[in-house]
Every structure is written in C-alpha cells, then in structure tokens.
Amino acid sequence: MKQQYSLAHLTVLGCPPPEMTYIAARAGYDFISPRFIYMGLPGEPNYEVARNPQLLRETKRALKSTGVRVHDIELARILDDVDPRSYLPALEAAAELGARAVLSSIWTPRREYAIEKFGELCDLARQFKLTVDLEAVPVAAVVTLADAVDVLRKADRDNAGLMIDTHHFHRALDRPEALDALPRKWFHFAQICDAQREIPADRAEMTRIMRGERLYLGEGGIDVGAILSRLPHMVYSLEVPHLARVRELGYAEHAFRCLESARSYVAAHAVRRKVQRATIAA
C-alpha cells in the first residue's frame, strides 16, 4: 500500500492555505494539514477560512486545481473555560473542504473538566464525520502517552483518536512498545519529524525547538522507525518547522526536502524490518 504524506502547517507557517497547497503539490504531497483555527500566538498568522470567505474560495481553487486534499485541521485546544462550540465554524469549513480529522490537545490541568470538554468536541465533530485526534504535548497539560490514553478511555467517544507526534513522544520518554496494547482504531495519522536526542530541561528551549528547529528524518537522535513500526499503516503528516532553514531555502524547498528525507527514511526502515523478520524466521 502506497505511503501517503501530508504537509503540516507548522512546517510552512508563513504560507496561507492556498500557497501551502501549491507548495505541497509541487513537492509531491498527497494532503495538507492546515491551521484553520487561530490560536493567537505571537507572530502566528490568522488563517481562519471560516471567517474569511475570500481565503476559503482561494483555498478551494488551489485544492481543485492541484488535486491535493485536506487531511486534518489544527488545532482545537482544550483550555480553561473553553466552549467547544466556538470551533463549530472551523469544523464546518473542514468538512466542506473534505477533511477527515481535527487535531486536539489539552492545556488545562483540570483533568475531569478536560475530559468533559474533549467529549463535547468529539460530539460536535461527529456530525461532520470528523475524528478528533488527541496529541500529548510536552509543554501542555496532557504530556505523556498514558495521559492521552486516560482521556480517551474516560471520554469514550467512537470518533476519538490518538495522534502520535514523534518529537513529543520522544520528549515524554514514552516507549514504543507501549503502543502495542492500544486499540488500532484509535490511530488515524501521525506527525513525524526528527530532533536532537538530548531533551531540553528548560521549557522555553523545548518550545523553541518544537516550533522552530525540528530536523529531517534520519538527521537527529529520535528512533522514529521504532515508533512507526508499532503503528498501523496511516498517513504521515510532516511537521518539521525549522526557521533557519526556511530563511535559507524558502518554504517550497524546505517542504520538498522534508518529503524527500521522509520517503528515504521510511523506505530504508521498511527494508530493515524485512531483513530483521527474515533473520528471526531463519
């Protein structure tokens, strides 16, 4: 089965969705994962197509002309005092553009409250035939794989999923074998990248790397292959923000190199796995 790839918006954050789509098409991606929910972070553009009819039209035009599709949208955060209904316009726009999923993360330490609101988000997304895929983030309130699993089990929604980001997984000191016991139906896509093996002790430094210095696959110290080998076949979203490389190469070339390195790494890892299985069988 052909491996499909999506271009995550954080990789090319300065590009509006139409430009992102054209870049993805030229590089050879199958999908885009746009950030249609504005988070209000310093220096981060607002790409809310639900509130910008012209941007929505231009995005539709780009998708139609290139054949690239929307895989998932970002980022429905569960914050203190969040009203999940505030995400309805983005969910509707996502469905209109053919998306399959909405990515979510939890930033409130109030676990029971977070579970309740995550469940409400899942219920809202269900009417648009969207899954809600939770990621553990090392600087958020749900940090580890165990944290995310706890939320999913207690929320108990049939359209809830678990999104593994290889950077976050490594930073949380999670073990790949822990993925074996989890329901396969939870896994819809993964975000993949590499990064330095050393885990920053400082939150600010971890955030800086997370948002602006991730590495091409095979370039850093994360055993990405060990993580992917525990997951079912799925779309890989390439979230590889690197501010210095973007300044040097431009968004288009950086996105292309992200995909080329991922394809090479995944292909080489698949060959190694076949050799290992053959050796064990012999």
What positions do the PLM features span?
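Histidine-acidic metal/acid-base catalytic patches
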Residues: 1-6, 13-31, 64, 93-98, ...
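Active-site beta-loop-alpha junctions enriched in small/polar residues
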Residues: 8-12, 35-39, 75-78, 106-109, ...
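Alpha-helix N-cap and loop-to-helix initiation/capping positions
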Residues: 16, 47-55, 82-89, 109-116, ...
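Glycine-rich, proline-tolerant flexible connector loops at the mouths of alpha/beta enzymes
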Residues: 33-58
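A short acidic, helix-capping loop that chelates divalent metal ions and anchors anionic groups
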Residues: 40-46, 79, 172, 244-248
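Short coil/turn segments at secondary-structure junctions
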Residues: 43, 102-105, 135, 211, ...
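Active-site acidic/histidine proton-transfer and metal-coordination neighborhood
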Residues: 62-69, 75-162, 171, 269-276
